[in-house]
């Protein structure tokens, strides 16, 4: 009996930690936010819609998060991105980075 409930406790905590991870990085929430705040310039697909904006599709999670936090803190400055980044929480930044990094891109190189 004791052993049984101990196992149950382990299973419950495993399930809980899996839920925490899922809540921590949520690409669907990231996509919804992209539609509200980023798509005009970077596209939902991460391919830039204005010439001065970079493509974000397939960029690594860590790079995207670092840049967004740098814009937010003022370490990196840009008249558009500094304004946008001010409105983002850590969780939103993680979700946005998760969305753009989840996009698969291919490169075609001229011979
Ligand atoms: C009004 C246009 C505009 C909007 C809206 C916008 N961006 Fe940007 N973004 C830019 C421009 C322009 C740059 C290039 C900044 C620079 O030259 O330093 C940039 C740069 C970035 C970079 C750095 C990329 C790199 O290669 O270093 C990231 C990451 C980024 N944007 C994410 C986002 C996210 C996420 C959103 C939505 C929350 C967003 N941007 C909304 C225009 C925009």
Q: Where are the language model's segments positioned?
A:
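Positively charged n-region of N-terminal signal peptides that target proteins for export
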Residues: 1-5
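Bacterial N-terminal signal peptides
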Residues: 8-18
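Sequence/structural segment immediately N-terminal to covalent heme-attachment motifs in c-type
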Residues: 24-44, 57-59, 109-111
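Gly/Gly-Pro-rich "capping" loops immediately C-terminal to redox-active cysteine motifs
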Residues: 31, 43-73, 82-87
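Conserved hydrophobic/aromatic "anchor" residues
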Residues: 34, 71, 99-100
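Detector for the c-type heme attachment site
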Residues: 41-47, 101-105
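C-terminal capping alpha-helices of c-type cytochrome domains
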Residues: 67, 86-111
């Amino acid at each position: 009996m004791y052993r049984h409930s101990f196992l149950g406790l382990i299973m419950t905590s495993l399930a809980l930690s899996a839920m925490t991870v899922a809540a921590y990085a949520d690409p669907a929430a990231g996509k919804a936010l992209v539609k509200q705040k980023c798509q005009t310039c970077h596209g939902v697909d991460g391919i830039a819609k204005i010439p001065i904006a970079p493509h974000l599709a397939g960029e690594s999670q860590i790079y995207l998060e670092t840049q967004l936090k740098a814009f937010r803190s003022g370490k990196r400055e840009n008249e558009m991105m500094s304004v946008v980044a001010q409105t983002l929480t850590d969780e939103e930044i993680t979700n946005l980075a998760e969305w753009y990094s989840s996009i698969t891109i291919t490169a075609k190189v001229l011979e």
